[in-house]
Amino acid sequence: MQKKLAIGIDIGGTNIRTALVDASGAVVGIRTQPTHAEREITEIMGDIAQGIGMLMSAHTVSRETVRGIGLGAPGFLSLRAGVIHNSPNLPTAREARVVSLVQSLTGLPVFLENDANAAAIGEHWVGAGQGARNLLCVTLGTGVGSGFILNHAIWHGSNDLAGELGHTVLVPDGLPCTCGRKGCLEAYVSATGIVNRTASALRAGRSSSLDACNKPGNPLTSLAVYEHAQRGDRLARDIFEETGRYLGIALANVLNLLDLEMIIIGGRVARAGDMLLQPAIHEVNTMALRAAYHPVHILQARLGDHAGVIGAAKTVFDRV
């Protein structure tokens, strides 16, 4: 029987998504399970292997029909060695040989990919980036993930560390970032950055209906900032406009460096839509040199939470 399916896995700090994906990029079946990231990485990988078995059983899929497993993981990776060196979202994953571990548990070929790269691969294959030769896919969530497609292929760089747009410095000596440095883009445009900047403005005395959302037992969230912005709260709207401007400045810098034809924006922060994207597009059109001669296509991602698993599965189809 032809091996027509691949398994794509997207490991997040909160949840793990596991999907059966066919050769056209369609998701045949998917399941979500909690990560419980504080556990030993061997336990997490064991849960992943068990989840794969449960998903295959639920869809009556035999091992013989599966080409392999694509493992999308966060952190600093060595793809050929199959190792997670370090990952803020997986604190016990230090020099973790996850590929050999999952292979031994499942008996299937396993291929490792950065989670943000996997999302970019998915969007390029069957999402908003179909047909584009050169693009950037940015995922705005708790942090900022990004992946570059150059000449129709994901760009890994010399040491599998390319694409860390979130840790390019936007403001010298600016806000502290989770990486330990100051002024990174992630500290300004991620969900965490939105919350921190809003809380700082409230502490400084800005008047806002968000005051009620910043109390003990009722922590401030980026969703609350968005909802209050929709209702017309001035501070909340200013925060999202400023977030869009910061994002647009970073994207214009990338365009001036790489002359990309398309930028895709995904993740839960991007669900703010025009409130975020319009100020970003304005900055790009003002600051990107190519904007004077060629249109810059900035699009919202299409695949949502499926982008990572679809892209991870594509890494299998590309190799087996």
Tell me what each language-model feature is.
Residues M1-G68, S78-V83, V99-L108, G122-A132, ...:
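ATP-binding/phosphotransfer module of carbohydrate and carboxylate kinases, centering on a glycine-rich
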Residues D10, G70-P74, E113, C137-G143, ...:
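Short beta-strand segments
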Residues R31-Q33, P88, S158:
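Short hydrophobic alpha-helix segments
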Residues P34-H36, T92-A93, A162-E164:
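A short acidic/small-residue loop/turn micro-motif
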Residues G82-R94:
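A charged helix-plus-loop insertion that forms the helical arch/lid used to bind
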Residues N89-P91, F111-N117, C137-L140, L299-D305:
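Active-site nucleophile and cofactor-binding loops and adjacent substrate-binding regions
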Residues A153, G157-A162:
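Short beta->alpha transition motifs characteristic of CBS
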Residues N159, T168-V169:
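Zn2+-dependent cytidine deaminase-like catalytic core
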